[in-house]
Amino acid sequence: MKVKIISVGKVKDKGLNELINYYAKQIKTIEMVEITDEASITGMEKEGQKILSKIAKDSYVISLAIEGKMLDSVEFADTLDHVTTNFGPSITFIIGGSFGLSHAVKEKSNLLLSFSKMTFPHQLMKLFLVEQIFRAQAILNNHPYHK
């Protein structure tokens, strides 16, 4: 599985960056791309165009959105397994900025995924996502990390 995470904004907290990097190193085949946060509702469209330009044509796109489908960790692992088996090894995850994702990005997405009905800062979502990708790999490989 080849993973790309496109996120709006930078993770400024050193501790969060260390945790994100810890899990990213465990995943190995991961690329993280940061898009400049435009910090306005009108800037969301500009962010969307930048995001779309970073998505590989053969990639399965999963965007994090509050209205998306909620999965538990095992269902998430099964989804990633299904995607890589049926659509190829390339998966792109997208984390929007404070105003969310543009309509164009949501339309390009193969799956809208929600971690909760609550709203979280994009910095925390990046950590949650990287950890869940690592956990999914552990589940699929019968590794004891997932209890």
UniProtKB/Swiss-Prot annotation:
Gene name per UniProt: rlmH
Primary site of residence: cytoplasm
Protein family (similarity comment): Belongs to the RNA methyltransferase RlmH family.
Assembly and binders: Homodimer.
Superkingdom: Bacteria
Gene Ontology MF terms: rRNA (pseudouridine-N3-)-methyltransferase activity
Lineage, top ranks: Bacteria, Bacillati, Mycoplasmatota, Mollicutes, Acholeplasmatales
Organism: Acholeplasma laidlawii (strain PG-8A)
Alphabetized InterPro entries for the sequence: Alpha/beta_knot_MTases, RlmH-like, tRNA_m1G_MTases_N
The protein's role, per its UniProt record: Specifically methylates the pseudouridine at position 1915 (m3Psi1915) in 23S rRNA.
Swiss-Prot/TrEMBL keywords: Cytoplasm, Methyltransferase, rRNA processing, S-adenosyl-L-methionine, Transferase
CDD domains according to UniProt: RlmH-like (cd18081)
Catalysed reactions, as listed in the record: pseudouridine(1915) in 23S rRNA + S-adenosyl-L-methionine = N(3)-methylpseudouridine(1915) in 23S rRNA + S-adenosyl-L-homocysteine + H(+)
Enzyme kind, highest EC tier: transferase
Designated name of the protein: Ribosomal RNA large subunit methyltransferase H
